[in-house]
From Swiss-Prot:
The keyword Thylakoid does not apply. Its EC number is 6.3.2.9. One of its GO terms (biological process) is regulation of cell shape. This is UDP-N-acetylmuramoylalanine--D-glutamate ligase. ATP binds at residues 126-132. InterPro entries: Mur-like_cat_sf, Mur_ligase_C, Mur_ligase_C_dom_sf, Mur_ligase_cen, MurD.
Length: 489
């Protein structure tokens, strides 16, 4: 046994391990455990999923049965969808059986040298901007000639890339993944921002922030100072090197903006990195994402030139402030990835005049303060989805002169055919068995187009999750783009 191997306890060859969840994460965990020599059993609530694994020779059990016999297992490795209050994790805790997430398993296997020399992990988290920042970081590392892999909550699970040659991992992690990764100690970790999100999973904002803060327990902690909740995490970070980034002029130990240039005063005395106007992501959010990515790149000695090169050639991902079309002087922007109020606010504030398409599942988050801050930018609003009433109430309080249209369908589960309407117009969608999301978005785009004038932006930035009417944020964005193309023909 090597000196590093005890970090893997209670995992050992032949150990009975329960894998919770049969999705993409579960498949990656099964492959890693089999490679290690453990004896995994997979549990899932979906009988069809279990049958698929049985056909592949995997031992399976229902989630409820697994909870009843939890003491048979030395370890549970869970998919991030299992909240700590779910019956299975609670049963494991009561029986004294450790619960890891797939990221925790990946971290321990990598640190133990199971895949060769351990990689240096650079981890990005936050309520918003994770994917763009992590992609920027990976581009910077690649431009510098460093062997980097993009993984985590973007691209492939970390476990799926560890057998590939690399020096560095650019890892996007969600609060769910971080909750189940208590021993993670990255080379550098960044918390971009903290806003109300996933409170239905974490229970409280404090627990959500504590999960995010786990990325700050490694060597270098990077935090967005313009976000008060994120900034508060820096003083308690365990990392010996603490770095902040801001939109204003940086102090020593920070990255920021001076004279239209991104400047590093944390890893150099005073190093100019790149011009602000070379950042392709619109608005302050693009500058902040670039600063965070640059901070993590600088913490592993990436020079200024490849950082600038990566940003100049960077392309924004799908459904992230993506311009779909410009027609009759109106710009149509798909920011379907804005799945919480904080993200929607950043999106709306990037444009001077906005017809806002919003609504869906708010997941317990409040939109009131966000609507108040961005009310001056709104020239119209089109509301969709189950929780559109909460958005309408906020608009009635803080933007009473903004015209509002509700897109209503009675066929979607949990939605009312005749909702409470706050002095607004109502567009009723007749859903006759086709694609509900397409019908809703077609009506929403038509209503937004009627409200917009030349120079305005019709912006899909829902502030909410999509699963009440769509398969996911990408499906919602695709429906928006298709509706726009059909409308401007």
């Amino acid at each position: 046994m090597s000196a590093a191997e005890p970090a893997l306890a209670p995992l050992s060859p032949g150990a009975p391990v329960l894998v919770a969840g049969g999705g993409i994460t579960g498949r990656a965990v099964l492959a890693a455990l089999r490679r290690f020599g453990a004896a995994p059993t997979l549990c899932d609530d979906d009988p069809a999923t279990l049958r698929g694994y049985v056909d592949s020779g995997v031992d399976t059990v229902s989630t409820s049965a697994a909870a009843e016999r939890i003491s048979r297992y030395a370890l549970v490795v869970t998919s991030p969808g299992f909240a700590p209050t779910a019956p299975l994790p609670l049963a494991a805790a009561a029986a004294g059986v450790p619960v890891w997430g797939d990221v925790e398993l990946a971290w321990r296997l990598d640190a133990a040298g199971h895949y060769g020399p351990p990689r240096r992990w650079l981890v990005v988290t936050g309520t918003n901007g994770k994917t763009t920042t992590t992609s920027m970081l990976h581009a910077m590392l690649t431009a510098a000639g460093r062997r980097s892999l993009l993984c985590g909550n973007i691209g492939s699970p970390v476990l799926d890339v560890l057998d590939q040659p690399a020096e560095l991992l650019a890892v996007e992690l969600s609060s769910f993944q971080l909750h189940w990764a208590p021993s993670l100690r990255p080379e550098g970790g960044a918390v971009l921002n903290i806003a109300e999100d996933h409170l239905d999973w974490h229970g409280t904002l404090a627990d959500y922030a504590a999960a995010k803060a786990r990325v700050l327990d490694g060597r270098v902690a990077v935090v967005g100072l313009d976000d008060s909740r994120a900034a508060a995490l820096l003083s308690t970070a365990r990392a010996p090197v603490r770095v902040g980034f801001r939109l204003g002029e940086p102090a020593a130990g920070e990255l920021g903006v001076r004279g239209g240039q991104l400047v590093d005063r944390a890893f150099a005395d005073d190093l100019t990195l790149l011009p602000v106007d070379s950042i392709p992501v619109p608005g302050p959010v693009g500058v902040l994402d670039a600063l965070a990515a640059a901070a993590l790149a600088r913490c592993v000695d990436v020079p200024a030139s490849p950082i600038a090169e990566a940003i100049v050639s960077f392309r924004v991902g799908r459904h992230r402030a993506e311009v779909v079309a410009v027609a009759d002087g109106i710009t149509y922007v798909d920011d379907s990835k804005a799945t919480n109020p904080h993200a929607a606010e950043a999106s709306v504030l990037a444009y001077p005049r906005v017809v806002w398409i919003a609504g869906g599942l708010l997941k317990g988050a409040s939109v009131d303060a966000v609507v108040a801050r961005m009310a001056s930018r709104l020239v119209g609003a089109v509301l969709i989805g189950r929780d559109r009433r909460e958005v309408a109430e906020a608009l009635s309080r803080h933007a009473p002169d903004v015209p509002v249209v509700h897109v209503v369908t009675g066929e979607d589960a949990g939605m009312d055919a005749t909702p409470v309407v706050f002095g607004a117009n109502v567009t009723k969608v007749k859903h006759l068995g086709g694609d509900l999301g397409a019908a809703v978005m077609s009506a929403a785009v038509a209503a937004a187009r009627d409200l917009a004038k030349p120079g305005d932006t019709v912006l899909l930035a829902p502030a909410a999750a999509s699963f009440d009417q769509f398969a996911g944020y990408a499906d919602r964005g695709d429906a928006f783009a298709a509706a726009v193309r059909a409308a401007i023909r």
